Amino acid sequence: MDNSQIENTIIDIRKRSGAVTTFNKDKISNAIFRALAATSKADRGLADQLAENVVNKLVEQGFTSTRTPTVEDIQDIVESTLIDSGNSDIAKAYIVYRHERRKLRDEKMNVLNLKTLDPVSKKFDLNCLRVLASRYLFRNGKSEIIESPTQMFERVATLVGIGDILYDSQIFDKSGNNPQDVDEAKSYLEKLDAFDYKFKVGDFFFNKWHFRSLINHYVDLANKGQMKIGFKDVLTLLAGKKLESYADKIQEYFDLMVAQDFLPNSPTMMNAGGRLGQLSACFVLGMDDEMQQIMKTTSDAALIFKSGGGVGINYSNLREEGDIVASTSGVASGPVSFMNIINTVTEVVKQGGKRRGANMGIIEAWHPDVEKFITNKTEPGVLENFNISVGIWEDFWHSLVNTDGNYVLRSPRDRKPVKEINSHQLLDLIALSAWKSAEPGLIFFDQINKYNVFAKARQAPLRATNPCGEQSLYPYESCNLGSINLVNLVKRQADGTYEFDWQRYEETIRKTTRFLDNVIDVNTYPVEEITTASKDSRRIGLGVMGVADLLYKLRIPYNSKEGYELQSKLSEALTYYSMEESVALANSRGEFPLCSKTEYPEGKIPISGYYERPKETHTYEWDALIEKIKTHGIRNVLTTTVAPTGTLAMIADCSNGMEPAFALVFEKRVTVGRFFYTNKIVEEVLKENNLYSDEILAKIADNYGSLRGIAEIPQWMQDTFVTAMDIHWSDHLMAQGVWQQWIGNAISKTINMPYDVTVDDVKSAYLLAHELGLKGMTVYRDGSRHKQVLHMTSENATKTFDVVPSLHVVQYVTDNITN
């Protein structure tokens, strides 16, 4: 029977939900092909022929355009067709496949509290849905899930789309010469319930919290004189369908997330279109040596934790333990004691059970309590809601090269010397503590401020970061982050190989830069000072995830020259196109308020690669971009960062950030439970090469999750599909350095080290990290923490191979450091 006859005979299929959809023979063929693959008989031609036989049987049994078959009818006939054709083994595999699919559907419906699954819920992996259900989907007062993943993505996309609507030419005038009555708009805040789902754009309805964001965004722009019409007139345009074109923008944002091409940071997905409305992940607060300020910071931190954000605080302004307190004639308790207060607040405010509270506690190397601070977390149970880092400035590096190595510790109260220590011994202490407990990290404030174009406007250097260290922020600044899934931008060639789609990458960067800029406008900040500081700089943090999976797809080793070159190009493109799009936004919407007071008008940019890489190695026209900035300004003070993306990568079903894969088989433990993962790309390759078996998987699990040294695995696979523990720590640093050259802010990455590294190795890593231009670093020696997020599936996992620096790193060190 040819296709035209099929189309005339069977037109539709009835799904389990009762919905009717178009019949598609290819779906039958694909299901049979998967059963063939399960029996190592992956034959597309045979699958197509068997699918044809299934259709013929459907017709024979009387199914027509008026008698529509159900999914179950078709699957029953597939089983009988496979048996009748003498393929009993394939039939068995199909029956197992069918049973597993039924079981998976039931599990998904149970997790989501649904009776049927829509296309988005079907598309997403079960573990992804578990994470969405546990943290992101709205619940009622009985803690029952009351929205589907589709509805979640719709509420996020709708809110972000509101950020575009008020910049429509019918409404917005950048000049700022349009006085409007903002009290009229504010009056609607008192009657939000009356406007719940009253307005929509296309098929996207505004709930009352969307409507609140529309009001607040209008008031913000009207206060600048940029609204040409009153708020009632805006509502008239909405009601009259004069703004329907923005449904396409909302759909674009929705599609980006549903396709797992891009995801914003967790608070955006948790809170967009909800009562809290707080969308940012990263915050920094100040802490001055005055009790009222300390208590305000504590209160502000609690509000941030409640809304799903994390806080970084530099405690170096607090006087050292034992110093005189003039007002009481007593002595100071020191900064660590106040960190304990914040730690307790974090413990009490559980962020609604959705996210564990997170802090970055920083003390700079010159502080008299630095030694106590360094060793504070070497025992379990101390400051468990904190990452801690030592802040390093130029003077510390200078002391390391001095003959005596003397380094002066000074009182924060009057900057007078308190004592001298040996800088080498201090670095040894940091290295020893990190070797024991993975704490503290190091933050290189000299590198952070080297190209800080914003310092001129703020009249101060940057002195703090968010909890994961990838965002350097001024006090009360926040930043909303988002990550592009790079592995989704790979396209398959006719010969079965893959290549990266650079055009789609550029398009995605531009769309997501606009997405994150909109988030600033529709955000409901937890503290007024944060609102002001965040909008003064309009800082965003666009990053990536899926780097390891991308390299696997392209068959490029992570720690190879080719791998580093590709990562450099990816990094440069990310920042170039995001900054170029930010300039375009400045041209249409206006530059960030403090732009004219920065070094941007002088032609400076916060990108080290522009200054430190030879111009002939630049891929893009940076000089032309600088001229555009001088002409039009730029919308966002910085646009790029690379976040760890732990939970986001689980939802996107890809590898974390720019990290290599931790292991090819591992267990992940998070707040909501224990999930098991196997790298799908490696699984496919093993199957393609007839190597996939329980025995091989057990060997990989028992080999520290690595392919290295397994006799049955070809050498090219061992070299290509490397894990974090296959890669020498110097290559981890090299990869971070390659990305850092082109990233405006910083990078959150773990420098993985095997159990048997020495304290001297850790110290050497610090020195190499600074030499490579990193803005900070964190080492993790395997087994050095009593609680470990990532675990090997096998309890018998052991490493049976040596790890050495790549030839690329050796050559770099030879050419740039030892000579």
Report each predicted region and the residues it spans.
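Extended catalytic cores of very large enzyme megasubunits
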Residues: M1-N819
